[in-house]
Design a protein with these regions (language model features):
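Secreted/extracellular ectodomain signature
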Residues: 1-204
Length: 204
């Protein structure tokens, strides 16, 4: 998918990978998003450096964590050089309803699927943080706690961990690991302001 997006954006002279972790399954080891994206440095559509290497991207040391990477609302651009609409950009009472969101491009859609922990590694396998390793579009069965969002309220149910390029939203506001979704269908993703977007990194 990232390669197709790069082609549409005129950057298909590079090899692109999605920043996605997968969880361990019987006979299948976990794959960490941080190990899928090359070594850096990475630049956005406008040529601005986002991070110089994997350690800088994730803040692996105290010094790097204090420095932080350069992924922000204004630098986390799409393959067409556009800012990803986020909270307070385009308010509408239906901006968490998929049927509205899918036909209205200027809606809050700042959630990025990652399935990852803050350090870019996969979650333990006991609970689902990856929509069954990106193969499921199932949603939780109706039940208690349907008014909230994320794994704190839906332990073990179909779910994906997300981040925010604008670092503004529920959970801790992290770029790569803020909170979970309400399920794995397009309808469920929209309920917490997502449309299934990915972070794409050039690996060469």
């Amino acid at each position: 998918h990232c390669q197709n997006l790069a082609e549409a954006g005129g950057a298909d002279d590079r090899t692109w990978q999605a920043y996605l972790s997968t969880q361990a399954r019987p006979g299948q080891p976990a794959i960490d998003a941080r190990d899928r994206i090359g070594t850096g440095p990475w630049y956005n559509f406008d040529g601005i450096m986002i991070a110089r290497d994997v350690a800088h991207l994730h803040g692996d040391t105290i010094e790097l964590a204090r420095l932080g990477n350069n992924l922000t609302k204004r630098t986390g651009l799409t393959e067409k050089g556009q800012i990803v609409p986020g909270l307070n950009d385009y308010k509408h009472p239906q901006d968490d309803v998929w049927e509205y969101v899918r036909t209205t491009p200027y809606t809050n859609r700042h959630e990025i699927l990652t399935g990852s922990q803050l350090d870019g590694t996969a979650f333990p396998s006991e609970l689902d943080y990856t929509c069954d390793n990106w193969t499921s579009n199932a949603d939780p069965e109706p039940g208690p706690n349907q008014g909230g969002m994320g794994m704190g309220l839906y332990p073990g149910r179909p779910n994906a961990q997300i981040g925010f390029p604008d670092r503004n939203g529920g959970g801790d506001g992290s770029w790569n690991s803020s909170h979970g979704t309400r399920g794995c269908s397009q309808t469920a993703l929209a309920m917490t302001h997502g449309v299934g977007k990915l972070y794409c990194f050039a690996i060469d």
